Amino acid sequence: MHTRFQAIWSDLSPQLQQALTPYLEQDEFPAMFTAEQVNALKTQLQCNDDELALALLPVAAACAVTPISHFNVGAIARGESGHFYFGANMEFAGAPLQQTVHAEQSAVTHAWLRGESRLVAITVNYTPCGHCRQFMNELNSGTHIAIHLPGRKVATLGDYLPDSFGPKDLNITTLLMDKVNHGYQIDNTSQLAQQALQAINRSHAPYSHSHSGIAVQMKSGKIFQGSYAENAAFNPSMPPLQAALIALNMAGENVMDIESAILIEKADSLLTQWDATQATLTALGCRQIQRVTL
C-alpha cells in the first residue's frame, strides 16, 4: 500500500478497509475504479454511487500534495462510463501560487486524460471555489453535472454557478472532453516526444488556438502526458504541465522525481507555455527540458 494511504487508514471504517484492501495494496493502484470495480464495491458495502463516492473522499484527499497550505482536499469524478476517478489538490513550493491545482480540476483532468468522454457528477469534501466552478463550466456535461458534498443536498453546477459565462457565449461548440485529434505530426520518433504529440493532439484550445501538450519521464522510466485545457474565462485554463503533474501524482509518483520533459506547441501561437513550464519544472528539480515547435 502506498504510504500516503497509510496515514488515513485508521480513519476508515473496518468495512471500507476490508473492501479497499485488495485495490490499495496493488503496487500500481491507478487512483480510479472501473465501473465493474465500482459495482463490486457497492455490492460489498451495500451502498449506492453517491454513498460510495462520499466514503472515498478521505482516500482521494490522501493523494494531495500540500507543502504550503497542508490543507488536503479530495474529489471523485464520476464518468458516464461508470468509472470513478480520484482527484486532489496540489501545490508546488518554489513556484507561484497560480500554478496550484484544485481537487476538482485534478479529478476532471484525471478523467479526461484517461479517455473519459463525459462526467455526470463531482463529489468533493469542501464547497467548490469560484475558480473550480468556472473550470467545470467548460465541460461537455454543461451546468447539469451534479455536485455532491458531505451533509449537503445534491445540487447542479448550474445551482453553484447561476447566470454563468461559458463556451456558448463565445459560440464555441467543441467542449472539454469532446473527442478531438488535431492531427499534428513531428519528426522526432522518441517515445517521450511521441507521447507529447498525443497530448497536443488532444488539447482543448478553442479560444486562442494555441494547442500544446507535454510528456514527462520519471526517474522510474514511466512517462505521463499533459494536455492544455483552455477555459472561456481564460484564467481557469489548465496548463499542460499541471495536467501531467496530476497524472503522475494520481499514479503514485513524486513530482520531485521528474527526470526529463518535452513540451510541444505551435511556433506561431498567440500564447506560449514554455516560460511557465520551464520555471515550474526547474522548481521541481527537473533540468532536462526540451521545447519542440510546430
Curated annotation (Swiss-Prot):
GO terms for cellular component: cytosol. Binds 1 zinc ion. It comes from the Bacteria. The active site is at E104. Keywords: Hydrolase, Metal-binding, Zinc. It catalyses: cytidine + H2O + H(+) = uridine + NH4(+); 2'-deoxycytidine + H2O + H(+) = 2'-deoxyuridine + NH4(+). Its cofactor is Zn(2+). Its EC number is 3.5.4.5. GO terms for molecular function: cytidine deaminase activity; identical protein binding; zinc ion binding. It is an enzyme of class 3 (hydrolase). GO terms for biological process: cytidine deamination. Residues 48-168, 187-294 form the CMP/dCMP-type deaminase domain. Zn(2+) binds at H102, C129, C132. Substrate binds at N89, M90, E91. Belongs to the cytidine and deoxycytidylate deaminase family. Homodimer. This enzyme scavenges exogenous and endogenous cytidine and 2'-deoxycytidine for UMP synthesis. This is Cytidine deaminase. It comes from Proteus mirabilis (strain HI4320). The gene is cdd.
